[in-house]
């Protein structure tokens, strides 16, 4: 990650902006949500909610420095994830938007077809100058 970003910065003679897309959330999604629920000024609420039972955020429980490197390098503006099908929250933490995309499935959990409000899409609009917006779109049947 770091080498690629620095190589792109050199190639284009400017600091490139990036976004990351993963299936499984990073542990910082949980950290940011916990800080948000405690009212910490370190986290800015963007939209949505955690819908999984017990406010679950499923992430690998092993040491990882990817997020710290993203903050240090300063290129990554947003990280988009899925996995937890009932979560659809967006939070800004340490300058990076942490965003759960909406689910599109009917098969993830028993009875999920009866659950309303979690299906849809996340529209990312990116301008030529690097400015972007994120809009959650709820699918209504």
Give the positions of each predicted feature.
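Binuclear metal-dependent phosphoesterase catalytic core
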Residues: 65-73, 87-141
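His/acidic metal-ligating clusters that form di-metal
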Residues: 1-82
């Amino acid at each position: 990650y770091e080498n690629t970003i620095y190589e792109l910065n050199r190639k284009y003679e400017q600091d490139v902006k990036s976004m990351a897309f993963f299936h499984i959330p990073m542990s910082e999604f949980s950290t940011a949500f916990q800080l948000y629920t405690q009212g910490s000024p370190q986290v800015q609420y963007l939209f949505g909610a955690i819908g999984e039972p017990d406010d679950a955020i499923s992430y690998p429980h092993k040491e990882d420095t990817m997020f710290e490197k993203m903050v240090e390098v300063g290129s990554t503006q947003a990280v988009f994830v899925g996995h937890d099908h009932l979560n659809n929250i967006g939070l800004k933490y340490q300058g990076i938007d942490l965003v759960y995309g909406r689910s599109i499935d009917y098969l993830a959990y028993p009875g999920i077809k009866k659950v309303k409000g979690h299906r849809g899409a996340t529209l990312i609009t990116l301008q030529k100058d690097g400015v972007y917006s994120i809009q959650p779109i709820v699918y209504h049947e």
